[in-house]
Amino acid sequence: MKFRVDDEVIVIAGADKGHRGKILKVDRDKDKVVVEGAARVWKHVRQSQKNPQGGRLNKEMPMSASNVMLVDPSTGKPTRIGVRYLEDGSKERFAKASGESLGQIAPAKASKAAS
């Protein structure tokens, strides 16, 4: 999965289709993301010492990563994410629609000849 926390995404499927928000959490094992303001549910909380008031909490639930697309920073439209190697050997993410860089993933690897 190529999503990162704080990426701006748009929901492309489901009840919140069209909603824009930042990614708050990424679960790579389950292939799910939590998007700010999307997939909100009421969680009923029982009274306890930790929560003496009890009541209902409105919280975001995880959604499948396939239901969101990254928003291209230059155009503001949904785009796919690609990975490319730079000349110095480091990897970066880029928006496929515009080719704009989305930040470095990994630094250049050290040469194996040195070992």
Swiss-Prot record:
KW Zinc-finger (keyword) present: no
Superkingdom of the source species: Bacteria
Record PROSITE patterns: RIBOSOMAL_L24
Cellular component aspect of the GO annotation: cytosolic large ribosomal subunit
InterPro entries: KOW, Rib_uL2_dom2, Ribosomal_uL24, Ribosomal_uL24_CS, Ribosomal_uL24_KOW, Translation_prot_SH3-like_sf
NCBIfam families to which the protein is assigned, alphabetical: rplX_bact (TIGR01079)
Quaternary structure, from the entry: Part of the 50S ribosomal subunit.
HAMAP family recorded: Ribosomal_uL24_B
Family that this chain belongs to: Belongs to the universal ribosomal protein uL24 family.
Protein name: Large ribosomal subunit protein uL24
UniProt organism field: Rhodopirellula baltica (strain DSM 10527 / NCIMB 13988 / SH1)
Lineage: Bacteria, Pseudomonadati, Planctomycetota, Planctomycetia, Pirellulales
